[in-house]
Structures are given as structure tokens and as C-alpha cells.
């Protein structure tokens, strides 16, 4: 982080740990860069005065409070943190409307939906077609997932991503989180969101309108495109890289998700229908279970067993506050540790 700070010369840098902050301050003593840490540091980053757009890309529910602070400071939000809307969408979306703040999606699928909505804001959405690659185990049955190793689950066929999201993609939990995120971002009912398995990852998602027209966003699987679109919206600066060549496309195929095998998606839909703090229990259980799997403490299929058990164990809260959301997370962690 010292190298990045020296290269980009930000006004402020924050780290998670106080001791790390002290070391970084010493390392950057010959610069004018301020160093903070912890939640206070995150909130300072999210609200600092020269900033006009905040990219929220923190993994997990740590992103909730800084995002709320950024909205209250009237910063445009480029959202890459699914958990913020999955667990606190009922807080974030009304708050953004109250402060007149735009939330621009960074995830490729939600960016595709957002792009497909441009110029059509007055036309009613019939359905959102949320595409999924299907992950490395597409086409397998549940019995074939016994004995899956960490290295097997980390081999995504199309995208290069971090470990946690790659595991989430393999279980289709990630797509479940994206369904909940789409519900909040685009103000639609769950019944209007349809997951479509599209192994080639060329169509990144689509919107069907009431007149039968379907508008989709296509492109190569390049994460830089949706990131740049959020940062420069509504402009589209030139971007180097591979281009989509329609003449080289052999097939574009589509299939329904197998909810019997990939129960993570089914459980996410169940959590979304339940509402309240149940999506938080779902998300927290998945975070901890994936960490256990990556550390080879549990088997692959136990990820879903843990999620289901935590959802059943959660005490329902219809309209949870941020503190209650975080308490639900702690309760899920405690339940798993037992």
C-alpha cells in the first residue's frame, strides 16, 4: 500500500489495523499523505471533501457504514460491494433517494442491466434476465460434487476473480446475492428477476420490456468495462483490450439453473422472499462457510448445509437497523463456531 500511495499520491489512506497505520505513517513521513485506520478511517475515505464519487469495493458488511456516510455526504456511489444492498438495501436505497444520490453498479451483470435501461426509464420492465456462467461445475449433479477440492472450485471457466467470489460462483451463491442486489437497485419484484445460465459469458444480462423488446449488453468478459462505465458515466472513453468479434462466436447457449444441485441460489431466493434480516443470516453464513472451506476445515457441500442451518436458526427481524444487521452477522458466526 505504501507503493500505491507513493504512485498515486492520495490525500488520505486508511488501513484496518492501528499498528499497520503507525507503520505506514512512518513509511510515508516524507509525504503529505494522511493515514487512518479502522471504521473511522473508512468513513473518512468515503466522505473526504475533494472526492465526488466513492467506489465501495470492500468485501463484506464492513461496507455498510462507509456507504451510508458517503450518501449523507452526497457522493455518487459506484457500488461493487454486494453485501451492502443484500443486507441493508431497505436502508441504503431510501437514503440515496432522500439525498439525491446516484448508485451506479460496478458488477458486470448489474452494469449490463443498468446500460440496458438507458433511454427507457419511462417504459415498464417486464423482466430482468440475469445471466450466469454456471461456474466450473455446470452440468454436474449433486452427487458429483462430493469430494470437490478447493483447487477445483477456484477454476472459473471465464472470469478471473478473487478466491471468495470464485467459490461463490461455483456454488451459485454469488448469483443469489446478485438477484437480491438487482431487486434493490432496479426496484423490481423478485418474480421479475430470472436467472439464465449462459456459459459463454458474452451477454452480460438483459432487460425485457412490456412491448416484448429485449435489450442486452454484450462484450468480452473484461471487468474493466463496467468499472470504467461507472466511473465515467454517462461517457464512454476509449478502452484498450480485446473486442467482441461476432463472427468468431460459435454458439450462444442458454439454460435454466439447476436449483436441486445448486441449492445456494435457491436458498438466496428463499432468503430474499423472507426479507428482514434473513438475507444477512444467509450472507454471513456463506462468508464464514467459504472461509472454512478455503482453509480446508469443511467439505464443499457443507457450505450449503451451514447456510441453511444459519437461516433456520436466525431470529427474524422485519426491518433491521444497521446495529441489528451486524448483530445478526455476529449471531451467525457464533452459531457456526459452536
Protein language model regions, located:
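Catalytic, metal-anchored helix/loop core of enzyme active sites in primary metabolism
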Residues: 1-338
Amino acid at each position: 500500500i505504501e507503493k500505491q500511495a507513493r504512485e498515486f499520491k492520495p490525500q488520505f489512506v486508511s488501513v484496518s489495523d492501528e499498528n499497520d497505520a503507525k507503520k505506514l505513517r512512518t513509511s510515508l513521513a516524507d509525504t503529505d499523505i494522511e493515514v487512518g485506520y479502522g471504521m473511522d478511517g473508512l468513513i473518512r475515505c468515503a466522505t473526504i471533501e475533494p472526492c465526488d464519487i466513492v467506489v465501495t469495493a470492500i468485501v463484506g458488511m464492513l461496507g455498510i457504514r462507509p456507504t451510508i456516510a458517503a450518501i449523507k455526504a452526497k457522493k455518487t456511489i459506484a457500488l461493487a460491494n454486494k453485501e451492502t444492498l443484500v443486507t441493508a438495501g431497505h436502508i441504503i436505497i431510501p437514503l440515496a433517494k432522500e439525498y439525491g444520490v446516484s448508485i451506479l453498479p460496478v458488477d458486470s451483470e448489474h452494469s449490463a442491466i443498468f446500460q440496458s435501461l438507458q433511454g427507457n426509464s419511462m417504459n415498464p420492465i417486464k423482466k430482468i434476465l440475469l445471466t450466469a456462467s454456471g461456474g466450473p461445475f455446470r452440468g454436474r449433479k449433486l452427487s458429483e460434487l462430493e469430494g470437490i477440492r478447493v483447487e477445483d472450485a477456484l477454476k472459473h471457466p471465464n472470469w478471473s476473480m478473487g478466491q471468495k467470489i470464485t467459490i461463490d460462483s461455483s456454488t451459485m451463491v454469488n448469483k443469489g446475492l446478485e438477484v437480491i442486489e438487482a431487486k434493490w437497485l432496479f426496484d423490481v419484484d423478485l418474480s421479475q428477476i430470472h436467472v439464465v445460465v449462459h456459459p459463454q459469458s458474452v451477454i452480460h444480462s438483459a432487460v425485457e420490456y412490456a412491448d416484448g423488446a429485449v435489450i442486452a449488453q454484450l462484450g468480452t468478459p473484461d471487468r474493466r468495462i463496467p468499472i470504467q462505465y461507472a466511473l465515467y458515466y454517462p461517457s464512454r472513453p476509449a478502452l484498450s483490450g480485446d473486442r467482441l468479434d461476432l463472427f468468431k462466436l460459435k454458439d450462444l447457449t442458454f439454460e435454466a439453473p439447476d436449483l436441486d444441485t445448486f441449492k445456494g441460489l435457491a436458498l438466496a431466493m428463499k432468503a430474499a422472499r423472507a426479507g428482514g434480516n434473513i438475507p444477512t443470516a444467509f450472507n454471513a453464513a456463506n462468508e464464514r462457510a467459504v472461509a472454512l472451506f478455503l482453509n480446508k476445515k469443511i467439505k464443499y457441500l457443507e457450505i450449503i448445509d451451514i447456510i441453511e442451518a444459519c437461516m433456520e436458526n436466525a431470529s427474524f427481524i422485519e426491518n433491521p437497523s444497521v446495529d441489528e444487521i451486524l448483530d445478526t452477522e455476529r449471531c451467525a458466526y457464533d452459531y457456526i463456531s459452536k
